[in-house]
UniProtKB/Swiss-Prot annotation:
HAMAP family registered for this protein in UniProt: NDH1_NuoN_1 (MF_00445)
Lineage: Bacteria, Bacillati, Actinomycetota, Actinomycetes, Propionibacteriales
EC number(s) per entry: 7.1.1.-
Membrane topology: Multi-pass membrane protein
Similarity-based family: Belongs to the complex I subunit 2 family.
PANTHER family: NADH DEHYDROGENASE
Protein name from the UniProt record: NADH-quinone oxidoreductase subunit N
Subcellular location field: Cell membrane
Top-level class of the enzyme under EC nomenclature: translocase
GO cellular component: plasma membrane
Length: 538
């Protein structure tokens, strides 16, 4: 008898009797909340009149992020950690911690998106599809149009980032990568200021991002050819049995790492970072500096620790070289920058190198697998929390310092604003000292824990190089303080104005500044929390 004609108890032919997919709604609730909120935001664009669209989008976005944070905290409180979504998603400790950081950063980013300073307009162009300088663009400006689509794009990007951080399957990781990359490509080209530069940034990011995605996918194919599965656990089993003999795993590992290091912004895959950060709208640059780097780091650690742990002798030294190159390029080239956004781009490259020191120290014979891995994961989460606080706050300050044409990002134009506006001077000092890793700030705590992870992992030489380049990078951070307090504006230059933040802007700045200091003065509670959430499910 033809086996296709066999009838099962369900009434279906045997070959068609496929088990229905099962989703664990509880652990994945934050993902579903964000997905629902993003879909509602799309409907708002379609059905809400233009006059009420902006306020409605802000309410929907903030409410969605708050509910998603509450849902994540509820999942953490329950304490159950399972592999969900047919084995494709792992809402484990690192994932849940990443979700909290990501969603909290998203709330700060909404403030940047919505901030109106100097004029009635935001940082986003009135008509993205019009030719820069055309009558159509001028008409859109006169009518005070806004692209409120940026809010659903933000939520879809956050949705992809959440899935990426939780991905326990290489295909899910690739799909999530594309989900959060595509909205970012669009957002990068929507700057109101320097339209042509913004469009150039979006095109560069898209082309190089497409190349990195292709390499990432090719690496997945090679790993699948070796393991016969896309799941990281199966890949780990294949690596154990074939270690030292399979060139296929090594080639696939390199290509996957290239795709992830591109998103982290590590040398030599960081050529896009200065141009994109400079040309993109300031709120988008701030969001990318924190969120993209955070989820890419967590994804990299999950692939290396869970799937490719047996190949640690191959990837450790490569990552160490990448870390040194990133620290060196970011710190040295940053010294020559005269534009604030471009300086922060090279700062982000240097920070990518610093945080990779902790990633490299995960696997050694001295610490053992479990202890070394746990210390590295928690150190990366602490570092990115500290970096996120300073970044969101400082990028918001960039929105405040303005000239007639928009934001004033030349470092020299900030001369003396610390004396004329003491509040912005104090905030600049707090955030810049945190970037530099000065004691009693969150940045010092972050660097301390990642350097300790590298040291305990047997990479003392890498830590010493990191300390050296930290001193180099401190020079251009301190230069900002010198300009803000001890320099005067040149005669004949256009005057610079410092806009007053909105109430939400003030709250964001105060929260970022306070937690930056608290993490520097009393870091142990946050370190303990991340230590408890630092083990990947396998």
């Amino acid at each position: 008898m033809n086996p296709a004609l066999l009838i099962t108890a369900s009434g279906l032919p045997a070959l068609l009797d496929v088990a229905a997919p099962h989703l664990e709604w509880g652990p994945l609730a934050p993902v579903f909340v964000l997905m629902a909120g993003a879909c509602v935001a799309v409907l708002v664009e379609a059905f809400v009149p233009r006059s009420g669209r902006r306020s409605t989008q802000i309410i929907v976005t903030v409410a969605t992020l708050v509910v998603a944070i509450a849902s994540t905290l509820t999942t953490i409180a329950r304490g159950t950690r399972i592999v969900a979504g047919q084995g494709t998603l792992a809402p484990d400790g690192p994932t849940l911690a990443t979700w909290v950081i990501l969603l909290a950063t998203g709330l700060g980013t909404v403030v940047l998106f919505a901030e109106r300073v100097g004029t009635t307009q935001t940082a986003f162009v009135a008509s993205a599809s019009s030719v820069p300088g055309s009558p159509l663009e001028a008409k859109a400006e006169q009518e005070h149009r806004e692209h409120t689509e940026v809010y659903p794009l933000l939520m879809f990007a956050a949705l992809g980032m959440m899935c990426f951080a939780a991905a326990n399957d290489l295909i899910m990781m690739f799909v999530a990568l594309e989900i959060f990359s595509l909205p970012l490509y669009l957002l990068c080209g929507m700057s109101r200021r320097r339209r042509l530069l913004s469009q150039e940034a979006a095109l560069k990011y898209f082309l190089l991002g497409a190349l990195s995605s292709a390499l990432f996918l090719y690496g997945i194919v090679l790993l699948y050819g070796c393991a016969g599965s896309f799941k990281l656990g199966d890949l780990a089993a294949a690596g154990v049995t074939q270690v030292g003999s399979s060139k296929l795993i090594v080639a696939g590992m390199i290509l996957v790492a290239v795709g992830l290091l591109f998103k982290i912004g590590a040398v030599p895959f960081a050529s896009w970072t200065p141009d994109v950060y400079t040309g993109a709208p300031t709120p988008v640059s701030g969001w990318m500096a924190v969120a993209t780097k955070l989820v890419a780091l967590v994804g990299l650690m999950r692939v290396l620790y869970v799937g490719l742990g047996a190949m640690r002798w191959d990837w450790q030294i490569v990552l160490a070289v990448v870390a040194v190159a990133s620290m060196g390029v970011g710190a040295i080239v940053g010294l020559a920058q005269t534009d604030m956004k471009r300086l922060l781009a090279y700062s982000a490259i240097a920070h990518a190198g610093f945080v990779l020191v902790g990633v490299v120290g995960a696997w050694t014979t001295q610490t053992g697998m479990a202890e070394g891995q746990t210390g590295s994961v928690s150190s990366v989460l602490v570092y990115m929390t500290a970096y996120g606080l300073a970044s969101i706050g400082f990028w918001l300050l960039i929105l405040m310092v303005r000239r007639a044409g928009g934001e004033s990002t030349e470092i020299a134009s900030w001369a003396g604003i610390g004396r004329s506006h003491p509040w912005i001077g104090v905030l600049v000092v707090i955030f810049v000292l945190s970037f530099a890793g000065i004691p009693l700030t969150a940045g010092f705590t972050g660097k301390l824990v990642v350097f300790l992870a590298g040291w305990r992992g047997g990479y003392a030489w890498l830590v010493l190089i990191g300390v050296l380049f930290s001193l180099v990078a401190a020079a251009f951070y301190l230069r900002i303080i010198v300009v803000v307090f001890f320099r005067s504006a040149k005669e004949g230059d256009d005057p610079v104005e410092v806009a007053e933040p909105s109430i939400a802007g003030w709250i964001t700045l105060i929260v970022c500044a306070v937690f930056t200091i608290v993490m520097g003065v009393a870091p142990q509670p946050i370190i303990d929390l991340f230590n408890q959430a630092s083990t990947f499910l396998r």
